[in-house]
UniProtKB/Swiss-Prot annotation:
The gene is fmt. The keyword Transferase applies. This is Methionyl-tRNA formyltransferase. It catalyses: L-methionyl-tRNA(fMet) + (6R)-10-formyltetrahydrofolate = N-formyl-L-methionyl-tRNA(fMet) + (6S)-5,6,7,8-tetrahydrofolate + H(+). PANTHER family: METHIONYL-TRNA FORMYLTRANSFERASE (PTHR11138), METHIONYL-TRNA FORMYLTRANSFERASE, MITOCHONDRIAL (PTHR11138:SF5). Its EC number is 2.1.2.9. One of its GO terms (cellular component) is cytosol. The keyword Heme does not apply. NCBIfam families: fmt. One of its GO terms (molecular function) is methionyl-tRNA formyltransferase activity. InterPro entries: Fmt, Formyl_trans_C, Formyl_transf_N, Formyl_transf_N_sf, Formyl_transferase-like_C_sf, Met-tRNA-FMT_C, Met-tRNA-FMT_N. Attaches a formyl group to the free amino group of methionyl-tRNA(fMet). The formyl group appears to play a dual role in the initiator identity of N-formylmethionyl-tRNA by promoting its recognition by IF2 and preventing the misappropriation of this tRNA by the elongation apparatus. (6S)-5,6,7,8-tetrahydrofolate binds at residues 112-115.
Length: 317
């Protein structure tokens, strides 16, 4: 039985779920997304969110409030008489009156294995911490931050060199299918929600710019996890002399260097060890696989080396 759905989401991660719900035949009465943002060199252009663009393509009404705390916005939401609200990376706080408005409440697609990595940046934090698995969960929303009971989950292995971008793309596809299944089971009253475990709670705080500079004194595994957890955005970076000028280089992909003992003395941390962009860390080394110069496009390390004279003995700072 089709449900009357309010969809709430903003970034590209949310789009496959919106598309899948529409394809499954549910009635999407409105889409809530964050307002268009200033873009362009002078900030004079307003760019709609990826979800807004998709909703307009599907012919669905779009609403872009800056807050849902006002009585007028809450009344407008309630007037939709929705069966359920589906929330995927919306970005605004939902007051209790909003959570309680739909007949079946609000459910959320969250990209972690709760209660690990509640909060804003679960994909990045999982990789930065060296986790071996992640996943998508559908949970019933309540006032606490990602504290609600879980209805469905699907696990996903985190491969050794997988970046946050890779995991993002995998989980957004998994999440779309999982949400369609959740709605189908809710319509039949066959979906059971189970309280999260009290143990193992961690928080995925938003990534801060101060975290993005690489600390080469850390062990190679930690540096590798740091790089891939921040790739492609905002991107971990370090500086190196290119043509007599210190240049900031984004480090987008790496791998742990083979054949090196973590305890082996490789010299100064940040030092270039060979002609393949192998870099010494506090213990062990990593090999850079993909980098990006300021103002340039991402490039394979081999391509970058053809245009930049980086040789053994040079050093990242």
């Amino acid at each position: 039985m089709p449900l009357r759905v309010i969809f709430m989401g903003t970034p590209e991660f949310s789009v496959p779920t919106l598309r899948a719900i529409a394809k499954a035949g549910h009635e999407i009465s409105a889409v809530y997304t964050q307002p268009p943002r200033a873009a362009g060199r002078r900030g004079l252009e307003l760019t709609p969110s990826p979800v807004q663009r998709e909703a307009e393509r599907l012919g669905i009404e779009v609403r872009t409030p800056t807050s849902l705390k006002g009585e007028a916005e809450q009344a407008a939401f309630n007037a939709l008489r929705a069966d359920i609200a589906v929330v995927v990376a919306y970005g605004l706080l939902l007051p209790k009156v909003i959570l309680d408005a739909p007949r079946l409440g609000c459910i959320n697609g969250h990209a972690s294995l709760l209660p690990r990595w509640r909060g804003a940046a679960p994909i990045q934090r999982a990789i930065m911490a060296g986790d071996l698995e992640s996943g998508m969960m559908v949970m019933r929303m309540e006032e606490g931050l990602d504290t609600g009971p879980v209805g469905l989950l699907e696990k996903c292995a985190i491969d050794p060199d997988m970046t946050a971008g890779d995991l993002h793309d995998r989980l957004m596809r998994v999440g779309a299918a999982l949400m369609v299944e959740a709605l189908a089971r809710l319509a039949k009253n066959t979906l059971t929600f189970t309280a999260q475990a009290a143990e193992g709670v961690t928080y995925a705080r938003k990534i801060d710019k101060s975290e993005t500079r690489v600390d080469w004194t850390r062990p190679a595994a930690e540096v590798h996890n740091h790089l891939r957890g921040l790739s492609p955005f905002p991107g971990a970076w370090s500086e190196i002399d290119i043509g007599g000028r210190m240049e900031r280089l984004k480090l987008l992909r790496s791998t742990l260097s083979d054949g090196l003992s973590p305890s082996e003395d490789l010299g100064e941390s940040g030092g270039i060890l060979d002609d393949r962009l192998t870099v010494a860390c506090g213990a062990g080394a990593i090999r850079l696989v993909e980098v990006q110069r300021a103002g340039g496009k991402p490039a394979a390390a081999s391509e970058f080396l053809r245009g930049a004279k980086i040789v053994k003995g040079m050093k990242f700072s």
